[in-house]
């Protein structure tokens, strides 16, 4: 049975302050710095709004990390924080130790405040946590505005919730005093009309990561593209489920041109994810030619490409230093894989993650990529599931990974011989072939983690795995 440490005298004295209706800002100025985090938590959780307002005005650190306390935001407590900031911004209070420069509404670890409070009590909190320099966090901060608000936006409802509505209105009314910095923007379901209003409020060149997964049509994406081009510090772009059906070829060409030319302005882009994006077919070269930076990650998944698109992959210097290449779910059946071989040769010195799951690659195509694959010495993860290849081809593939000493995870398809004429996996045969293949691998090298996987089960949607024994699917 654990015994709770009794509160220290200083903590008890601090809590009594929160119950003092006549609490004055001058009293808080004399409060030891170490008491501010635990007392702020107490005031926030118990909704002592007047005390919160005063504590914000007397906050002795550069940054107020409010985000982790906003899991279940209370409008009254949030408004009290804003009222305290107003008093500072309008100089209604004069403080000897006004340090607060950043209101941080980003989502940090839930136990951040608890760890912070305990560390403060032990006098061991690193200065980097207490007084992290805000100038390092936002390229737009140059001391022009006294307060910066950091926020990550996830727009998944049709309209903004009360908390965001209150914040945006507050920022808009204090133009010139408050800089709103959004680094991460996720659009997962909101109507674009409402998204547009938000994009007009935030500083677009602060945004570093964008995810779009709203089932947009290509014309809606075209409406978004002018805003994308203003995100000059963008490092990561995720684009999913863009539908280009029901528009003429002329319109499609026009919209694709509008979108791809924005990449000319994105000179910090490092990670590009395109999932189920139908307009790439026949237009991949148009996008790649506009990339002006070297990507670390390129993911083109569940897309339809032409063979000519695959040929363009190895042409452009922007993908010559890839660490991650993910083409999973993009059908490459009946394509020549020589262009993929050329690309693998080009990125062999840097590639760490290669995913070719469910590409429809067959025996006759595999040999083309084996020489280049065997020279990807930095590879740590290789996934090749869902490709219908024979036992002999799979053995040949495994032999070409002998010298890849950095491999930590390998995922291979169950051999074609594991299935009956109806395409249903025969578990006993799969187990036998899995054991034989594992034995041959271990005779050549000691793999760290290797799995043989069946196709997806039509009943449960999972794969069966072989890792020394068969792990059945869930149905």
Curated annotation (Swiss-Prot):
InterPro entries assigned to the protein according to its UniProt record, in alphabetical order: LRR_dom_sf, PRAME, PRAME_domain
Cited Gene3D superfamilies: Ribonuclease Inhibitor
Disulfide bonds: none
Keyword flag Aminoacyl-tRNA synthetase: no
GO MF term list: ubiquitin-like ligase-substrate adaptor activity
Keyword Nucleotide-binding assigned: no
Ranges occupied by LRR repeats: 97-124, 179-203, 204-230, 231-265, 266-291, 292-323, 324-342, 348-375, 376-400
GO cellular component, one term: cytoplasm
GO biological process: negative regulation of apoptotic process; negative regulation of cell differentiation; negative regulation of DNA-templated transcription; positive regulation of cell population proliferation; proteasome-mediated ubiquitin-dependent protein catabolic process
UniProt keyword list: Leucine-rich repeat, Repeat
Similarity remark: Belongs to the PRAME family.
Protein known as: PRAME family member 20
Species: Homo sapiens (Human)
């Amino acid at each position: 049975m654990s015994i709770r440490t009794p509160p220290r005298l200083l903590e008890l004295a601090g809590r009594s302050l929160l119950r003092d209706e006549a609490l004055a800002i001058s009293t808080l100025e004399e409060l030891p710095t170490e008491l501010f985090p635990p007392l702020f938590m107490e005031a926030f959780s118990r909704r002592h709004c007047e005390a919160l307002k005063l504590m914000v005005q007397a906050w002795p650190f550069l940054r107020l990390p409010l985000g982790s306390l906003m899991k279940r935001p209370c409008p009254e407590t949030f408004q009290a924080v804003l009222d305290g900031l107003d008093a500072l911004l309008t100089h209604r209070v004069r403080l000897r130790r006004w340090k607060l420069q950043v209101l941080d509404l980003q989502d940090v670890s839930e136990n951040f405040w608890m760890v912070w409070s305990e560390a403060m009590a032990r006098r061991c909190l690193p200065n980097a946590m207490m007084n992290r320099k805000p100038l390092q966090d936002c390229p737009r901060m140059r001391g022009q505005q006294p307060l910066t608000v950091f926020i990550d936006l996830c727009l998944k409802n049709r309209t903004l919730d009360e908390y965001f509505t209150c914040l945006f209105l507050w920022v808009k009314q204090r133009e010139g005093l408050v800089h709103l910095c959004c680094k991460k923007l996720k659009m997962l379901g909101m109507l674009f009309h409402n998204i547009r209003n938000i994009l007009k409020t935030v500083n677009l060149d602060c945004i570093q990561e964008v995810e779009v997964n709203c089932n947009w049509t290509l014309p809606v994406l075209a409406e978004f593209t002018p805003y994308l081009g203003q995100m000059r510090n963008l490092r990561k772009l995720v684009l999913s489920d863009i539908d280009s059906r029901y528009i003429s070829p002329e319109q499609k060409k026009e919209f694709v041109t509008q979108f791809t030319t924005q990449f000319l302005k994105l000179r910090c882009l490092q990670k590009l994810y395109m999932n189920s994006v139908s307009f790439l077919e026949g237009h991949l070269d148009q996008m790649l030619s506009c990339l002006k930076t070297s990507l670390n990650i390129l993911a083109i998944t569940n897309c339809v490409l032409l063979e000519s698109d695959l040929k363009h992959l190895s042409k452009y210097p922007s993908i010559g230093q890839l660490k991650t290449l993910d083409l999973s779910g993009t059908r490459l059946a009946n394509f020549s894989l020589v262009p993929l071989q050329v690309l693998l040769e080009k990125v062999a010195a840097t590639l760490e993650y290669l995913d070719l799951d469910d590409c429809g690659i067959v025996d006759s195509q595999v040999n083309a990529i084996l020489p280049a694959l065997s020279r990807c010495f930095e590879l740590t993860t290789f996934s090749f599931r869902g490709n219908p290849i024979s036992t002999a081809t799979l053995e040949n593939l495994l032999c070409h990974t002998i010298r890849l000493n950095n491999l930590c995870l390998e995922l291979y398809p169950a051999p074609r011989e594991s299935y009956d004429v109806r395409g249903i996996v025969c578990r006993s045969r799969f187990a036998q072939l899995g054991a034989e293949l594992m034995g041959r691998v271990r005779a050549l090298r000691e793999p760290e983690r290797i799995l043989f996987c069946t196709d997806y089960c039509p009943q449960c949607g999972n794969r069966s795995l072989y890792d020394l024994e068969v792990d059945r699917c869930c149905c």
